[in-house]
Amino acid sequence: MEERPAETNANVDNSASPSVAQLAGRFREQAAAAKETPASKPTRRKPPCSLPLFPPKVDLGQNGEEKSPPNASHPPKFKVKSSPLIEKLQANLTFDPAALLPGASPKSPGLKAMVSPFHSPPSTPSSPGVRSRPSEAEEVPVSFDQPPEGSHLPCYNKVRTRGSIKRRPPSRRFRRSQSDCGELGDFRAVESSQQNGAKEEDGDEVLPSKSKAPGSPLSSEGAAGEGVRTLGPAEKPPLRRSPSRTEKQEEDRATEEAKNGEKARRSSEEVDGQHPAQEEVPESPQTSGPEAENRCGSPREEKPAGEEAEMEKATEVKGERVQNEEVGPEHDSQETKKLEEGAAVKETPHSPPGGVKGGDVPKQEKGKEKQQEGAVLEPGCSPQTGPAQLETSSEVQSEPAVPKPEDDTPVQDTKM
């Protein structure tokens, strides 16, 4: 009974021990096998997965000899397969452009033609050549015959230059036009100088120049017309000196201003001189004569030189002696009437055959005043010198012998 359990224990131990050892060996073997098998398995499994991504050198060393040639053979196979297709496509392309483009080698123009039809598919390679030639042909008329670019740029430049010309030169052109027609500043300066100091010279020019026009009927009347005309050309040379329009315009304006100034002066003098003249009627003609002479001479001595005025008066007196006897109211001009009346006052013994009466003295003084008015109104013939004054003066001369009392004073007042 003791041996059996011992045997059994031994068997158990043996069975157990070898079992453990065996198990351990088996486990080790299994573990080694397990290690070996997975080591072999991944070597077999990894290369196909790793080859396309990146070829491992270890695998290439073991299996690369087998798998590398197919890898190396596959790309040349693809290249060989793709190359005939590409060559066929290139051949097709080369034939078309070669047929379209004359004198082109089949390969190089084919490659060039490949680029061109893709970029410009509808135009085909012939169109670029055609386009380049007409573009060159178009550039010639564009630049020379019908230059749109050249025209646009000059247009902008011209517009700018024209704007500057319109801004700047109008002042120069306006100055030139003023210099041709006479600058306004010169007109005003001349007018002011003539108003201040040169009015006397203008008065010299005004009286003879316009006494010549009404004095034209005096040609058959005697020495008075000669005296007026001798003074006319003597004083007219300044008018003849001025050939330009500007000077004539200036002189005309100066004469108009002189007329206006003289009218104002004489109207004031006449208004002041009427009443003392009418009050001095009973005085002797000798006293009234020099006063009248002073009145007659004062407006003219203001304007011309004193010597010319004296010469003019002397010639007028000589001519008026003859005219008082011969000339009637029909042939008398306004100037001759006033000059005759002035002569009658100056030289009382030569008065017409009615004698010097008290009634004649107002006539003479009125004639003096009329002469002053006429000197003012001769050139312009302003509305003051109307038919009334002519009629009154003609009446005074037509009836020299009839003694008229102071009834003419209202007539004179109406004139004024």
Swiss-Prot record:
It comes from the Eukaryota. Residues 8-20, 382-397 have a biased composition (Polar residues). The keyword Phosphoprotein applies. Residues 1-84, 98-416 are annotated as: Disordered. Highly expressed in skeletal muscle and more weakly in cardiac muscle. Also expressed in several lymphoid organs, including spleen, thymus, peripheral blood leukocytes, lymph node and bone marrow. GO terms for biological process: cellular hyperosmotic response; protein localization to endosome; retrograde transport, endosome to Golgi; skeletal muscle contraction. Residues 244-273, 292-349, 360-372 have a biased composition (Basic and acidic residues). The modification Phosphothreonine is found at residues 124, 336. Pfam families: CAP-ZIP_m, RCSD. InterPro entries: FAM21/CAPZIP, RCSD. The keyword Phosphoprotein applies. Dephosphorylation results in its dissociation from CAPZA2. Keywords: Phosphoprotein. Residues 227-330 form the RCSD domain. Residues 159-176 have a biased composition (Basic residues). GO terms for cellular component: actin filament; cytosol; early endosome; WASH complex. The modification Phosphoserine is found at residues 17, 68, 82-83, 105, 108, 116, 120, 123, 126-127, 135, 143, 177, 179, 216, 244, 267-268, 284, 298, 333, 351. Interacts with CAPZA2 and CAPZB. PANTHER family: CAPZ-INTERACTING PROTEIN, CAPZ-INTERACTING PROTEIN AND RELATED PROTEINS. Stress-induced phosphorylation of CAPZIP may regulate the ability of F-actin-capping protein to remodel actin filament assembly. This is CapZ-interacting protein.
